[in-house]
């Protein structure tokens, strides 16, 4: 005759977080073993590609993991992939170059260079700094 199984938890529905499988114990009994969800690798914030060099884990496990398992040692490591970071660095460099060229052109034409206006502190912020 088949051995009957009793649930270890109260939830009886077959939901994503309540998957079970039957396991035989060393004592010969059949019991339910609750299966954990599959671990995933974090994705790039821009292109949604899996980040390489990061250990797959559940979000609740990540605070207990050491830093070297969660990131790679580079700017935006663990947030952006290498391709998106490269694009961002190049774009920032080109924008800076455009600003420099604009200033040089203005100097050649003899026009005074317009500087961005200074942000004045509000009365509240000024009183706090004193």
From Swiss-Prot:
Keywords: Ribonucleoprotein, Ribosomal protein. This is Large ribosomal subunit protein eL34. GO terms for molecular function: structural constituent of ribosome. InterPro entries: Ribosomal_eL34, Ribosomal_eL34_C_sf, Ribosomal_eL34_CS, Ribosomal_L34e_arc-type. It comes from Aedes albopictus (Asian tiger mosquito). The gene is RpL34. The keyword Ribosomal protein applies. It comes from the Eukaryota. Disulfide bonds: none annotated. GO terms for biological process: translation. Residues 111-130 are annotated as: Disordered.
